């Protein structure tokens, strides 16, 4: 299974993805947006640069999924169409987890993506303003049967 955490920078994607791996899926592979950018030397935050980074993460996740591995991805991945096409490609074997928060300051607001397209259907909504990371993880585990 692929667990795809999406949301604005600073929303808690990486924290929740790391907790999911640590507590419930220790053998899963982790793909993180910042690490992908370092690995492929992609510091281009334009729309094309983001699409390229997300496409690379999707290819790696798809490959690992085809090998029977669980994959946990945490990426801003702001483009709805790109995420939906990936879900269709994998016959909807992806759990999309939309991580967001209220208007509080978290320290990475300068990296926010203008025009981020929130999921519209077939996703789990996690508002990290309303619960601790462990409470959010409990919701993920319960709703997705991890």
Question: What is each PLM-predicted segment?
Answer:
Residues 8:
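P-loop (Walker A) phosphate-binding loop of NTP-binding proteins
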Residues 11, 17-62, 66:
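Conserved substrate/cofactor phosphate-moiety recognition/catalytic segment
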Residues 24, 89-92, 121:
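Short, structured coil segments at secondary-structure junctions
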Residues 100-146:
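Small-molecule kinase domains that catalyze NTP-dependent phosphoryl transfer to phosphate-bearing small molecules
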Residues 2:
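Walker A (P-loop) ATP-phosphate-binding motif of ABC ATPase nucleotide-binding domains
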Residues 28-30, 94-98, 123-125:
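Conserved beta-strand scaffold positions in the cores of enzyme catalytic domains, especially
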Residues 5:
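Hydrophobic anchor at the beta1->P-loop junction of P-loop NTPases
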Residues 47-91, 95, 101-104:
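Glycine-rich phosphate-binding loop used to anchor ATP phosphates in small-molecule kinases
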């Amino acid at each position: 299974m692929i667990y795809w955490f999406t949301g604005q920078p600073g929303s808690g994607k990486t924290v929740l993805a790391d907790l999911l791996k640590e507590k419930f899926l220790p053998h899963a592979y982790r793909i993180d947006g910042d690490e992908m950018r370092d690995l492929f030397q992609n510091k281009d935050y334009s729309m094309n640069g983001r699409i390229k980074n997300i496409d690379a993460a999707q290819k790696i996740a798809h490959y690992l999924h085809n090998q029977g591995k669980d994959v946990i991805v945490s990426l801003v991945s702001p483009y709805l169409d790109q995420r939906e096409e990936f879900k269709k490609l994998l016959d909807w074997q992806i759990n999309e987890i939309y991580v967001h928060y209220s208007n509080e300051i978290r320290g990475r607001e300068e990296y926010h993506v203008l025009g981020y397209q929130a999921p519209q259907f077939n996703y789990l909504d996690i508002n990290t303003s309303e619960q601790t990371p462990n409470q959010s993880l409990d919701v993920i585990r319960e709703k997705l049967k991890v």
